UniProtKB/Swiss-Prot annotation:
Residue ranges constituting the CSD domain according to the UniProt record: 4-63
Keyword vocabulary terms for this entry: Activator, Cytoplasm, DNA-binding, Stress response, Transcription, Transcription regulation
Induction: In response to low temperature.
Identification of the protein by name: Cold shock protein CspB
Record has DNA-binding as a keyword: yes
Gene: cspB
GO cellular component assignments: cytoplasm; nucleoid
GO molecular function, one term: nucleic acid binding
């Protein structure tokens, strides 16, 4: 699992990017966010995740919000 911070997330469109120190930003789709209820992320929020190869390159999977 990697750790990063949410760079930005558009809850209307359901996607955004996660910043990872020393690496390129990683695309995140709302469907990759773990948990119940409305799936969104806040700018600057700490998250842990895995990287998988998507249709358009690397993207986040199994995203969990850090306490």
């Amino acid at each position: 699992m990697l750790e990063g911070k949410v760079k930005w997330f558009n809850s209307e469109k359901g996607f955004g990017f996660i910043e990872v120190e020393g690496q390129d930003d990683v695309f995140v789709h709302f469907s990759a966010i773990q948990g119940e209820g409305f799936k969104t992320l806040e700018e600057g929020q700490a998250v842990s995740f895995e990287i998988v190869e998507g249709n358009r390159g690397p993207q986040a999977a199994n995203v969990t919000k850090e306490a």
